[in-house]
């Protein structure tokens, strides 16, 4: 149903999909279109998106390009990294964590301009449609959502290219003259999907990567980097205090220089199918390794293990789009409550694709040399271990005795 919409706010990147959607909304809904482009540190000039929107008939006052980099890292990336979050054991959720912020700002703009609908460019096969729309409905329950991929007949990238050519919409080309990979980029990562990557057996072309050198071509000498944490969040790199966005930018530079953070993954989408994606997350990988190293000497054992138990659930909530859900907020409160003592400095060694913790120190350290030393000590009576072991072995002994009796 295409009637009843007077003004719609479109999440607009200036790329193929959303440029076609912009024109399609104008033709199909005959409504006023407001474009919103989020600067999340994707590393590209955003003014062309403004120019393209104007070329397609959008009035200047209806074009919003917002710098959200600091908010993105401070309020979304850092809280997620406090949990050491990994989806299916490997994915650092670079795409997933950006969607709640985009949804939030899109709804704010809709309220500001009096729009009665919002629209996005996510396909009907992927996770992003769910992530965007769960955010919309959580923040504005009565909003109308337009999802063109679920309405139109343009059911392939070839069809989109034909539509763009017909309407003289300029589309970016890669260096071989073909339509580029489907990508998503922000300060945390860049992802690649489509084209040859749809065959999970095919190795990605090296010229696809933009944020990291090939590990085998990384410097032949290791580099050490120190990351300082305060209450679980990074605040400085090599002694220099930086804003959240600047800090992640610097970690991206360091990690990318040493070929760190590449991931080739087949993941389970929320909608039920498997998909293959290739990711570059250099700074996020350094941050993940360092934060875990910081927790290793500052967190109580059972608090750490509890975090490890809830982390997969927390990661699944973010991956599936439930950032604004009460259960995610409850888990966040638990996670944040563990971070007050996660303070100190972690030293990493970067070398040809690897990042290893080689040093850590904290004013809140629970590591006690006088207790763990292999040398003589006066604080720990090793005889105490005997009773501890026997008590923990009691159920095992009783179980075996019962089995022996038949």
Curated annotation (Swiss-Prot):
Its EC number is 6.3.4.5. Belongs to the argininosuccinate synthase family. Type 1 subfamily. PANTHER family: ARGININOSUCCINATE SYNTHASE. L-aspartate binds at residues 123, 127-128. It comes from Rhodospirillum centenum (strain ATCC 51521 / SW). Keywords: Amino-acid biosynthesis, Arginine biosynthesis, ATP-binding, Cytoplasm, Ligase, Nucleotide-binding. This is Argininosuccinate synthase. It comes from the Bacteria.
């Amino acid at each position: 149903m295409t009637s009843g919409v007077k003004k719609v706010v479109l999440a607009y990147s200036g790329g193929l999909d959303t440029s076609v959607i912009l024109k399609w909304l104008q033709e199909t809904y005959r409504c006023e279109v407001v474009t919103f482009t989020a600067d999340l540190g994707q590393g590209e000039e955003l003014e062309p998106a403004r120019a393209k929107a104007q070329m397609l008939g959008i009035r200047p006052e209806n074009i919003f390009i917002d710098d959200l980099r600091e908010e993105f890292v401070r309020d979304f990336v850092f809280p997620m990294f406090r949990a050491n979050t990994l989806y299916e054991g490997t994915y650092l959720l670079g795409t997933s964590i950006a969607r709640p912020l985009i949804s939030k700002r899109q709804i704010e703009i809709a309220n500001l301009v009096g729009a009665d609908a919002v629209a996005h460019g996510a396909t009907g096969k992927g996770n992003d449609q769910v992530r965007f729309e769960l955010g919309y409905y959580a923040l504005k329950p009565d909003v109308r959502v337009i999802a063109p991929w679920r309405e139109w007949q343009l059911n392939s990238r070839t069809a989109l290219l034909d539509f763009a050519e017909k309407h003289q919409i300029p589309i970016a080309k890669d260096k071989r003259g073909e339509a580029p990979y489907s990508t998503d980029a922000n300060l945390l990562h860049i992802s690649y999907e489509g084209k040859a990557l749809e065959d999970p057996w095919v190795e990605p072309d090296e010229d696809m990567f933009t944020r990291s050198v090939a590990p085998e071509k990384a410097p032949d000498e290791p580099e050490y980097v120190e990351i300082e944490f305060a209450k679980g969040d990074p605040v400085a790199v090599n002694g220099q205090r930086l804003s959240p966005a600047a800090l992640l930018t610097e970690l991206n530079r360091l990690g990318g220089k040493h070929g760190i953070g590449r991931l080739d993954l087949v993941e389970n989408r929320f909608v039920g199918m498997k998909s293959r994606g290739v990711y570059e997350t250099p700074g996020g990988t350094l941050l993940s390794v360092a934060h875990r190293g910081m927790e290793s000497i500052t967190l109580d054992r059972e608090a750490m293990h509890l975090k490890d138990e809830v982390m997969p659930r927390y990661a699944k909530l973010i991956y599936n789009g439930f950032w604004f859900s009460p259960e995610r907020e409850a888990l966040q409160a638990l996670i944040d409550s563990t971070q007050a003592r996660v303070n100190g400095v972690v030293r990493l060694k970067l070398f040809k694709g690897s990042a290893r913790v080689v040093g850590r120190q904290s004013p809140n350290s629970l590591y006690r040399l006088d207790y763990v030393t292999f040398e003589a000590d006066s604080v720990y009576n090793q005889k105490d271990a005997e009773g501890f072991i026997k008590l923990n072995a009691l159920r095992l002994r009783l179980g075996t005795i019962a089995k022996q009796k038949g």
